[in-house]
């Protein structure tokens, strides 16, 4: 009896490895690599088994090209990218995870009688005011002074401080540098720095912490401005000289508002004039003062007509050579890190709903990214400690 086989297109096999590697064991990954080399041809039965394991429809194995994924968020990239099909499995998983959390919290808050988040879409019909005026309105909404970040000790302090202020108004802020708890599923900073999901009751900002600490603040503020306008975005800004914006006029406006929130013009110029160094050195000193990245500082200085584009390019060339590596030596333990990555209000809501019997422990484990009751209780203890 002849066993039916089918030579699957290598594009399909490569795509399977990209999006389903976490569902396949080593044996299946090795089999697929052998098929890709042409050393063996898969049987129909093997493809049926692979379809179930990978959760990929059986018919997709007979296509000549991978199907286009309909991920709405990918349509809202800051910078145009012609290679739309080349989306990493890590990004897809992270979008799926954050959408699940945002959807759950949206339903929870509606059920519990919460009011919609006032900040979302406040600037939707506000197109006449200057970037500086809008920045002042946003600062006023959060009760922040114009020099709010100058007095803080470090980049991390500034980020944490602003995150706390934002989340106190019901906006969800989640962070991570990899998918779930799998450090092998690292996020790529060249693919995206952050994204924002617009929801009336549970708007969510996600920050890719693979980015440097001094760059995260700009990403957070940039996405906050998108929330002000009520516009979803996948922030993949790369600080290039002439980026291919999908919506150039709007994104330039968002960037200028974000600049004004971080770099108040009056204080920026005052510090600039007080430093007796070269312009190159001034950029680094002011970046440290405002708890921002040298590139964001250089672009702002150019917009304030203090430096040339040539110096911006020089700063970009130097900073792009830096490789940021996070050190785990002497750092917080697993559960402290998990509690930090999760939005505190979200984690509290899940735990409260679970304790009341409205959410199953299995669903809670999935939402909070824990595997068992011990991990759940460890996380719960840290969340409750912060609530005191």
Task: Label every model-predicted segment.
Residues 1-388:
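Active-site hotspot residues in diverse enzymes, especially metal/ion-binding acidic/histidine motifs
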């Amino acid at each position: 009896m002849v066993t039916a086989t089918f030579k699957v297109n290598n594009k399909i096999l490569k795509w399977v490895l990209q999006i389903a590697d976490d569902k396949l064991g080593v044996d299946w990954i090795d089999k697929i690599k052998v098929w890709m080399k042409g050393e063996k041809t898969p049987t129909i039965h093997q493809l049926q088994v692979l379809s179930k394991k990978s959760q990929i429809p059986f018919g997709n194995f007979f296509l000549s090209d991978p199907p286009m994924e309909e991920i709405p968020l990918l349509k809202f990239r800051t910078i145009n990218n012609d290679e739309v099909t080349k989306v990493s499995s890590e990004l897809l998983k992270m979008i799926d995870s954050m959408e699940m959390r945002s959807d759950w919290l949206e339903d929870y808050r509606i059920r519990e009688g919460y009011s919609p988040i006032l900040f979302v879409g406040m600037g939707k019909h506000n197109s006449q005011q200057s970037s500086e005026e809008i920045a002042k309105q946003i600062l006023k909404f959060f009760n922040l002074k114009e020099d709010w970040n100058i007095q803080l000790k470090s980049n991390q302090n500034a980020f944490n401080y602003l995150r706390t202020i934002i989340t106190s108004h019901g906006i969800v802020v989640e962070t991570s540098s990899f998918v779930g708890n799998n450090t092998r599923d690292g996020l790529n900073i060249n693919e995206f720095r952050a994204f924002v999901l617009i929801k009336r009751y549970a708007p969510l900002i996600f920050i890719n912490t693979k980015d440097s600490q001094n760059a995260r603040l700009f990403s957070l503020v940039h996405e906050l401005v998108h929330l002000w306008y009520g516009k979803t975005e996948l922030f993949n800004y790369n600080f290039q000289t002439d980026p291919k914006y999908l919506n150039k006029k709007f994104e330039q406006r968002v960037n200028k508002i974000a600049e004004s929130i971080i770099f108040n013009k009056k204080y920026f110029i005052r510090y600039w004039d007080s430093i007796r160094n070269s312009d190159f050195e001034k950029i680094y000193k002011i970046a440290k003062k405002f708890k921002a990245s040298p590139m964001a500082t250089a672009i702002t200085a150019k917009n304030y007509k203090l430096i040339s584009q040539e110096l911006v390019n020089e700063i970009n060339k130097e900073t792009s050579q830096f490789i940021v590596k996070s050190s785990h030596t002497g750092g917080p333990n697993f559960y402290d890190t998990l509690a930090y990555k999760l939005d505190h209000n979200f984690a509290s809501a899940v735990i409260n709903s679970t304790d009341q019997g409205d959410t199953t422990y299995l669903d809670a484990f999935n939402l909070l990214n824990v595997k068992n009751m011990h991990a759940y209780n460890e996380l719960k203890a840290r969340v409750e400690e912060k609530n005191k």
